């Protein structure tokens, strides 16, 4: 972002910092020490300003970067303060702070998700976090607005917030990367075009993660088409275990549980062992064969098998489109909830006998699904961020046929993006028909 674009707001930023320092000087108690300093205003091709405070409140001169020097992500407001707490006053029960990077951080989904993360709802009431928010030049003002709201919310577990537009800065040392940002499919855009446009975004983000993120970073890809975007991302991050990459199919799982509960006349917490197989598209396979209601097989509880085979899957696929008709926009809050659910499924032990759905790397899978894909399958976790595939599932011809169709689609998407995964020239022979979910067009 050019300096000229940020200059009008700099004095306002400085004034805010001066006011903050004045307020702090009168309110800080003796037992907490703050190291406060006014940082020079860096100028670079990546742009940005830094905000902090110092007792003398002298504006620093504009710093001109050396050739090749790059900017850093911006700490924001109160999060620019350096805390120096006495050892005996530190919270003894808190865990070591974890760093979470979020792309598309100025969007509606993130606007719901970030506050769940900051509140402790996702990682727990004893887990402090640092949020690193990735936006674009166009969304940078909105990104500052998000940071302001986080600042005003006074979350004790939120210890640091930084904002920026360069993934190589924002992904530095990230232990979780929630990749939400992607271009939506516009009018007249072919599916192959969307695969290419968003694939380039996730190829670049994969390279950035590979270069600067934690070697054990956990990555959840939300931007669509999420399965193939996750595959592209992991192929561009060879230093990170492929097993650490997930495509989000949890919203599909949650929707399937809701519809089964409605049909059975029970509350949705009675539905377990729900699997979404395959692609996050209209070829997805909500598995009612292995799912249970109150511990019993779904087909035992719901006698209307025609409904299960002919209507149930279509209802899940069309749920997003139905929401748009009512709400006027695609789902944001429920998507944020599903991201939170997906993370919680990895950081808390899976209840005995249950499992959850996630689109993960297929190498070594026990189901006979083609390898080298990102395919939604049933998983269990011990709560350590890792997972294992569930082996004790059953298949019938109906389920296998539909899984095969989704597999063929993902193989075609892989061929269509071969130029982004280092596997040669792309050949787009996508199956006939439009399989994008109605809520994502």
UniProtKB/Swiss-Prot annotation:
Single GO BP term: malate metabolic process
Reactions catalysed: (S)-malate + NADP(+) = oxaloacetate + NADPH + H(+)
Pfam short name (any one): Ldh_1_N
Positions annotated to bind substrate: 185, 191, 224, 255
Transmembrane intervals: none
Presequence extent in this chain: 1-51
Site note Activation of NADP-MDH, residues: 75, 80
Record: active site: 280
Alphabetically ordered keywords of this record: Chloroplast, Disulfide bond, NADP, Oxidoreductase, Plastid, Transit peptide
Compartment(s): Plastid, Chloroplast
Residues involved in NAD(+) binding: 205
PROSITE patterns assigned: MDH
Binding site for NADP(+): 104-110, 198, 222-224
Cited InterPro entries: Lactate/malate_DH_C, Lactate/malate_DH_N, Lactate_DH/Glyco_Ohase_4_C, Malate_DH_AS, Malate_DH_NADP-dep_pln, Malate_DH_type2, NAD(P)-bd_dom_sf
Family: Belongs to the LDH/MDH superfamily. MDH type 2 family.
Biological role: The chloroplastic, NADP-dependent form is essential for the photosynthesis C4 cycle, which allows plants to circumvent the problem of photorespiration. In C4 plants, NADP-MDH activity acts to convert oxaloacetate to malate in chloroplasts of mesophyll cells for transport to the bundle sheath cells.
Subunit-structure text: Homodimer.
Protein name: Malate dehydrogenase [NADP], chloroplastic
Organism annotation: Mesembryanthemum crystallinum
């Amino acid at each position: 972002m050019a300096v000229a674009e940020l200059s009008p707001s700099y004095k306002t930023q400085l004034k805010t910092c001066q006011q903050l320092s004045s307020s702090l000087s009168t309110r800080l108690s003796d037992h907490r020490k703050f190291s406060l300093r006014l940082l020079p205003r860096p100028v670079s091709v990546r742009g940005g300003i830094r905000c902090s405070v110092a007792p003398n409140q002298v504006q620093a001169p504009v710093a001109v970067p050396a050739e090749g020097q790059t900017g850093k992500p911006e700490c924001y407001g109160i999060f620019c303060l350096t805390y120096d707490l006495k050892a005996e006053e530190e919270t003894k029960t808190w865990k070591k702070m974890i760093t979470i990077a979020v792309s598309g951080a100025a969007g509606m989904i993130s606007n719901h998700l970030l506050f769940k993360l900051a509140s402790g709802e996702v990682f727990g009431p004893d887990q402090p976090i640092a949020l690193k928010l990735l936006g674009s030049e166009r969304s940078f003002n909105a990104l500052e607005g998000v940071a302001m709201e986080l600042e005003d919310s006074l979350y004790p577990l939120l210890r640091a917030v930084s904002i920026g537009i360069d993934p190589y800065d924002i992904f530095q040392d990230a232990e979780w990367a929630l990749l939400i940002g992607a271009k939506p499919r516009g009018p007249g855009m072919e599916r192959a075009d969307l695969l290419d446009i968003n694939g380039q975004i996730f190829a670049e983000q994969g390279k950035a993660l590979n270069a600067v993120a934690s070697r054990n970073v956990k990555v959840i890809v939300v931007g669509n088409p999420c399965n193939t975007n996750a595959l592209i991302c992991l192929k561009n991050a060879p230093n990170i275990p492929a097993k650490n990459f997930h495509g989000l199919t949890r919203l599909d799982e949650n929707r399937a549980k809701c519809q089964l509960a409605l049909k059975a006349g029970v509350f949705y917490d009675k539905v377990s062992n729900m699997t979404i197989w395959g692609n996050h598209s209209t070829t997805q396979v909500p598995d009612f064969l292995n799912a249970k209601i109150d511990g019993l097989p779904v087909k035992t509880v719901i006698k209307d098998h025609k409904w299960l085979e002919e209507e149930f899957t279509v209802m899940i696929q069309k749920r997003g489109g139905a929401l748009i008709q009512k709400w006027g926009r695609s789902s944001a809050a429920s998507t944020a909830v599903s991201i939170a659910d997906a993370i919680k499924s990895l950081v808390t032990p899976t209840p005995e006998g249950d499992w959850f759905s996630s689109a993960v790397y297929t190498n070594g899978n026990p189901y006979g699904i083609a390898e080298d894909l990102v395919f939604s399958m049933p998983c269990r976790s011990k709560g350590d961020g890792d997972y294992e595939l569930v082996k004790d599932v059953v298949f019938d011809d109906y389920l296998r046929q539909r899984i095969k169709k989704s597999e063929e689609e993902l193989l075609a998407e892989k061929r269509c993006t071969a130029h982004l995964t280092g596997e040669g020239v792309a050949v787009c022979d996508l199956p006939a028909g439009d399989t994008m979910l109605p809520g994502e067009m």
